[in-house]
């Protein structure tokens, strides 16, 4: 560039250009005619560079059109007007002149479409398919770019609505999960028409933008891996919804809570992955302990809370409980019922209104089923869940009544309260909240995802019917007894499918069967084939061992039922699975492109509609490859000419450049279209071939569409056999759980407990804590001797030094009870166990800041719940009741609560840990060893150095009697507290102890002296004081 040109260019940016008089006067007239005169301009500042957007305007680029076309249409006068309007100072505008307003940007059809979609779906992040990418626009693009750590692109466009970030379409499934994990609702927008179909069918103008629609809406709990690519590993392996989730992951529920009143609640929870529906009605108080228990089981990620019409917000205790369980939980508040019609007090009208809404999503038979079997509060939960799940196309989760279960069924199993789950570390430990050291981790040796899911239910719901427990124990004994090749073969099969969630795949088929949108099927072809082929394989395996199964000598009715059902299905219904598989062409597995998999999934001649499209394709292929090729050969005088395919372009002919001049006239006259030219060859396509090729491509698109439609019908046929497939999977899951319990029960020194249904006996020889012994060697075993056949040893008061093993002992008792009723063997020499229907534990010192409760308040609320919910088959464990308040009040409450439990008509079994020695006198108040004092063994080593505390050695064994000293100073020493502080504390402790003892001696001496003087006329109170002193001194010895 010459210096003159460079100077000219720079002056356009940095120098104020004075327009000619004629141009200025014309511009002034135009501006003045449209707007009132402007005030005189301010004094001109020093010249400054234009903004980047202004520079672009000066060069004729407005950001919406191609820069070349813009420059061509921009005249000199327009260029001057732009410069004048963007120049900040230095121009000689008159007082009447005003800069012309910038011309409004014209939106392209695609931009208009993006804005329309964004306007219609403001509550979600939209991933819009444009070419081979999915793009996010506007403010949502900024959020997504931060989540995915990808580039946020503005392209110097001032309109932030079109700033974007993008991801490849092949990575949609992976990135979508990452966005959903942050709690967002996401809509996937796909292009639902192709260029060729648009041209042939002429559904819209050729200039119109491609039609796009929201084909799927997802949240964390409702995404089932729908957008996984056919060729991804997760898709082939058939993993559950998250594809990367492990079998130990907590299920993700969507929960609807109905706050009927301050104390009455209804709840319905759905797990979309497996189609499970759980309901319950219950009473609760301000502590929301019952609600917390249910939420702890369900671990919801999305919650709908219904409040009555008079309440405009969720109650504080309910909201705090939800945040306590999952602070990232998405909470939606709904006031009243969507079916309210002004007669909300009339149940009949309310019922009719609910039925009207349900009938939009369910058939008449199902609506009647829900109306008859569930109360109105439960029906309202169903109603709101139907409305909520409709957006995600999951309403048919309510179409299988067999999947609907009650949260609590006292005749079958017990529900462990939230405090019990946490204190016993059933699913997670209390240290880092992982599964390490938990009971579930010990018991979970399952081989499959669906087996682990069922075992989690078994662990959280111990059985209460003695025969059901015996069946599981007997199944373990049968599986342990001797090697069985049938059991081993099925076990190997389960290991083979450890990453395949058959239960989840079956649910996906059910959802997809009613989804009319082929762009958003919940399951892909490979997953369908995996499900069917593995179901066939297990049935063939059972058929193979038919004689062995019939000759089984199993005593367990549970095992007999599993093998009998599988054998019956293999003999009568395997033909159904074989018929489905006979329609599938296995060559589709090797296809790399999803469109090719679609075409080759079904065998030829399986469907007339597909064959019709194949015939049309063959017809046009023949036209192009035979008739048109023959014409081309004659025209170009080359009998050996063949089509070539390059860069995805089909049916091209290649002509060397040195022959092109000779054939130029023929190529022009015969309508040959130039496709591409290189240094050596030029590629053409004849115009008539192009027309036939369009028709061929159209029918290829129609073939894919037809294959998708037939695949949809195929899924409907599969879904009609849902019950059959579910029965096979359920039996496999039960067998997997029994194998898992057998593995744990085969650990060293585990034994089958003897069950007693008559009383609450717990007699265990050399009992060990099941999880601690796995983490620590040389665990000290203890005997458990609780036999209340004659109302003896029903209440155990346990004292002892800190860190002596008191909590470990009572947890061992509770865990052995839970393991027994789950159906597992116990870590001990031998055991005789009674059957409990509830286990309550009050342990630990935890406040609840979210609920606004202090440590002591939480302690008292938990005690109140235990007292109100206990039964005649309850195991109650109380740890240091009353320690959260003053000593006098604490002792008084501990004494009164324990005495109430002793005298209760329910007569529960109670283990009471305390550091209050005075409570031990209850042993003397109740005869026949109803209350017994125990302590954890230790050995005290006296220290001859004055002022030094004695050393103690913890023995961790349970001994009869009471201990007055908790040896807290020794624990402080172990914790590393300064030696000087401990010495000072020891001196104070000894002085206080001697003062108390001296006071007790004087009180005793005074009472004894008065009694001796008065002889037989002593008052009962005086005699009680003497008895109390003598008994306390005797017990301490």
Swiss-Prot record:
Residues 1-107, 229-249 are annotated as: Disordered. Residues 1-30 have a biased composition (Polar residues). Residues 36-47 have a biased composition (Pro residues). It is found in: Nucleus. Keywords: ATP-binding, DNA damage, DNA repair, DNA-binding, Nucleotide-binding, Nucleus. GO terms for cellular component: nucleus. GO terms for biological process: mismatch repair; mitotic recombination. InterPro entries: DNA_mismatch_repair_MutS-lik_N (IPR007695), DNA_mismatch_repair_MutS/MSH (IPR017261), DNA_mismatch_repair_MutS_C (IPR000432), DNA_mismatch_repair_MutS_core (IPR007696), DNA_mismatch_repair_MutS_N (IPR016151), DNA_mismatch_repair_MutS_sf (IPR036187), DNA_mmatch_repair_MutS_con_dom (IPR007860), MutS (IPR045076). Belongs to the DNA mismatch repair MutS family. MSH3 subfamily. Component of the post-replicative DNA mismatch repair system (MMR). Heterodimerizes with MSH2 to form MutS beta, which binds to DNA mismatches thereby initiating DNA repair. MSH3 provides substrate-binding and substrate specificity to the complex. When bound, the MutS beta heterodimer bends the DNA helix and shields approximately 20 base pairs. Acts mainly to repair insertion-deletion loops (IDLs) from 2 to 13 nucleotides in size, but can also repair base-base and single insertion-deletion mismatches that occur during replication. This is DNA mismatch repair protein MSH3. It comes from Candida albicans (strain SC5314 / ATCC MYA-2876). The gene is MSH3.
